[in-house]
Amino acid sequence: SLNLIGGAAYRKQRAPGTLGQDVDVVGGEVKRDFDINPYSYASNTSRVLDPSATYVANYAPFNIFNELNNNYIDLNTLDARFQLELKYKPVKGLELSLLGAFKYMASTQEHFVKDESNQALAYRAMSNGIIRDANKYLYKDPNNPYVLPMTVLPYGGLYHKGDNRMSDYDIRATANYSHTFADKHIMNLFGGMELTSIERQRNAFEGAGLRYDAGMVPFYIYQYF
């Protein structure tokens, strides 16, 4: 007998761009920079604010609609599973069985922070000395404390990409022999082998100074790194 089972699922989604959580292990405070989740924004923003107007956040221009168009994450996920079971009886009392299973999972996450997003503009917010000193996204030269903080992202935006892949297969072969002697003696023999393998891969890429409006040409300075 032969039995085949298979299934696959694919998901493509676009989510608002955001960074990972920062946890203060001393005070227990949890915060997330550049959080533009629409539900969170609507829940924590005053209703008297005009959603089409431009305000200031992180010392840079901010508009929620502009952010959703210029700071987002594209997610692609694939999950496929297949199973094969084969049973064969070459002679009376002997059954051979082969079971194989294969699973493959892949996910890709691309975070686009375009030139005009609040996050990219925050790295360039230094209109006066007060903002320069207060903006934590500017670079302060540790070797020259008297120099004003400078931007590490004079042009362009940011790009983050992460790939996660996993392949898993399992093969099991068994043999079962059963025989009755003189209608009162029963002999059962069973043997088998199993082979399992799991392989995981993770790749990450971070690009700085990518000019989305100029053919994705990078322009960056070494202080960013």
Where in this protein do the model-derived segments appear?
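Surface-exposed loop/interface segments of Gram-negative outer-membrane beta-barrel transport/assembly proteins
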Residues: L2-D79, S97-L99, K103-F225
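Long hydrophobic segments that form regular secondary structure
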Residues: V91-K92
